């Protein structure tokens, strides 16, 4: 009888520990994003939008093929959506759409950011400019990270603006000869929420950015303009801060989502992931893109504290499962607007959708 009693105590303690661990994880994550089926997809390709390409000097239907992978921010009580748009030749440019309610958007007629006859054309043509992520800087301007694609090599680049009309392209984030011609993508800057604004946050005297599209790495800067890759001092190779996991939904690759959010619990990063062809999550089709979350130490941004064991969003709608690339939910846009978090994501590399959470992270 005594042995049974002791066993019961052990089982109960184990259950309590498990519950405490689950509650601890719930305390730092974004929870319960609900897809807005009544409105989705909120943006779709449109052949009626024309733009005179400065490279070819010919009119192009700049968003006729696909719209996808948006970033978002709040300005003057409205939600601004910067989204990737592709023409029939698959060249990418960035369009702008504005919304009063965060759901229904009005597109601007012409792209606001695109390849031009400038010193960065060698990086951006003919593939274009892809997958934007935007944050506010402490001086109230905006920092945009994006992927330039010359048709062979993708490079993580950045630009700055004060008015979203006049942009100053700054070139590749990683300027050193060691990295400038290597493949890099997807820069998510660490920010702190001030009201509805997401402002780049200094930690230990540096700004930080997560990047990569296989594993995650980091770059740092003292001024948001000059960036250095975080390297191992001994091996001189990039410090790997997040990797795929065999047997999981994120077994093939991991890639940053929107900005990384500085909170009391730590730095919360939503990340995109892909399911491998084998040694994967067998409940999902191979190569499925879904999104999950990881927590880093708020004082040591490369130190992982926790990581969710499953995705919080994955393709289960027709427009997410069938498109330019099947089985894709790719998260890049996040705003805090009217007391709720609104998440914007690309669907099957073809359209854009929205999900909403009331969680007060």
Regions found by a protein language model. Give the residues of each.
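Glycine-rich phosphate/diphosphate-binding loops that line cofactor/substrate pockets in enzymes
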Residues: 335
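Beta-rich carbohydrate-recognition and catalytic domains
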Residues: 15-127, 135-252, 261-324, 338-361
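C-terminal structured domain segments
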Residues: 324-327, 331
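Sec-dependent N-terminal signal peptides
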Residues: 4-13
